[in-house]
Design a protein with these regions (language model features):
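Short, low-complexity Pro/Thr/Gly
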Residues: 1-177
């Protein structure tokens, strides 16, 4: 058995981005795959998500564990200019969540010999993100003027000064069958 093509995208039934408990964007694995087809002409992300250009490559029995890196392309994170200003969302809460529902692994396996595989599992899940924060005076200025950019002599000035990368780790993943 082997994973279906683009298994990284196929395993995502949906991914929701929530701010203060409210869903502000929701995508599914098929849409992530379509976005990849439209925005990755050189196929650089294909190895990251288990995607191949020839379906015959999926006929080989896979016995090794694999690692996939799945970019979650929500509407606000395609480029830094589309970043979501959380403090302008109308809520005092700055908490945000990403909720991901995975498909059953049995639906992601290709069985070419008619056999079954009972050992497929997700053993680890990590989410990586970059969080940008503004200085207090910048936040106040943006709230007052509702402008996220300024132009000086035709050049764009970015207001973001602090970058804080973080990693979320989850030990146990529960999949719906």
């Amino acid at each position: 058995a082997n994973w279906t093509n683009a298994v990284g995208f196929a395993m995502i039934e949906y991914a929701k981005f929530k701010v203060g408990g409210t869903v502000v964007d929701e995508q599914n694995g098929l849409w992530f795959d379509i976005q990849n087809e439209l925005t990755d002409p050189n196929k650089k992300q294909w190895p990251l998500v288990g995607k191949v250009d020839d379906p015959l490559k999926l006929k080989y029995f896979q016995t090794k564990s694999t690692k996939y890196i799945i970019p979650l392309r929500f509407s606000f994170n395609k480029s830094p200019g589309q970043a979501l200003p959380i403090f302008l969302t109308g809520t005092d809460k700055t908490e945000f969540e990403i909720e991901i529902k995975f498909r059953s692994l049995n639906n992601l396996l290709l069985h070419h010999s008619g056999g079954t595989v009972n050992t497929a599992s997700i053993t680890e899940f990590k989410a990586h993100a970059t969080y940008y924060s503004l200085e207090n005076y910048e936040t106040t200025r943006i709230r007052n003027y509702r402008q996220t950019r300024e132009y000086n002599n035709g050049q764009l000035i970015h207001l973001i000064e602090t970058v804080q990368p973080f990693t979320f780790n989850s030990g146990n993943i529960v999949l719906d069958d």
